[in-house]
């Protein structure tokens, strides 16, 4: 929806907040929320069931996945599959590896200065049309590279090689 504040969701697990950098990102997002009254709504959720978490995700525009990541994992892929923007690892090497030109992940890096991340987030939240396009491109990326039928076929080929005694394809 284009009306109202941009909703940012940060899913947190007490045992992973430092490892994933979500506590650090929550602090940064809260600062932005204070600086942009009425324009941003930041919500942190902790230890929800998957069903409850997915409901929260569906109500959000942007989901902060993790700061300390090189490529998107399950949470980021779920976020993009549901047509939401994800902030996570999305380094160039990841896109090269999957042979993807579209870069729909708001790339986070612990090497980047927090003030720079904050300004990039501010710019992202100010451009609702850009957010919409990024969300659509994320959905398409997941469809292209993570279709369940394609992944199942990869697993099947791998297991067939194992059964034949050649896990590395040197049949």
Regions found by a protein language model. Name each.
Residues 128-160:
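A charged, aromatic-enriched C-terminal amphipathic alpha-helix characteristic of glycosyltransferases
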Residues 58-71, 84:
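Acidic donor-binding loop of glycosyltransferase active sites
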Residues 52, 67-72, 93:
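Active-site donor-sugar recognition loop in glycosyltransferases
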Residues 113-132, 163:
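C-terminal "capping" alpha-helix adjacent to the active site of nucleotide-linked donor transferases
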Residues 1-49:
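Conserved catalytic-core segment of nucleotide-activated headgroup transferases in glycan assembly
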Residues 54, 76-81, 95-96:
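Short alpha-helical segment that forms part of, or immediately flanks, the ligand-binding pocket
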Residues 85-93:
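Short hydrophobic beta-strand element within catalytic cores of glycosyltransferases
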């Amino acid at each position: 929806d284009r009306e109202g504040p941009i909703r940012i969701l940060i899913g947190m697990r007490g045992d992973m907040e430092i490892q994933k950098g979500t506590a650090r990102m929550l602090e940064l997002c809260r600062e932005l929320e204070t600086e942009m009254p009425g324009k941003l709504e930041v919500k942190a959720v902790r230890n929800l069931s998957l069903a409850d978490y997915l409901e929260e995700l569906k109500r959000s525009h942007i989901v902060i996945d993790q700061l300390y990541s090189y490529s998107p994992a399950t949470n980021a892929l779920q976020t993009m599959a549901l047509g939401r923007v994800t902030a996570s690892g999305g380094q160039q090497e990841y896109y090269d590896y999957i042979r993807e030109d579209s870069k729909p992940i708001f790339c986070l890096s612990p090497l980047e200065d927090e003030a720079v991340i904050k300004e990039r987030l501010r710019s992202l939240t100010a451009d609702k049309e850009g957010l919409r396009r990024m969300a659509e491109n994320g959905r398409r990326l997941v469809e292209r590279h993570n279709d369940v039928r394609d992944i199942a076929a990869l697993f099947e080929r791998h297991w067939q090689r194992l059964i034949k005694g050649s896990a590395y394809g040197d049949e």
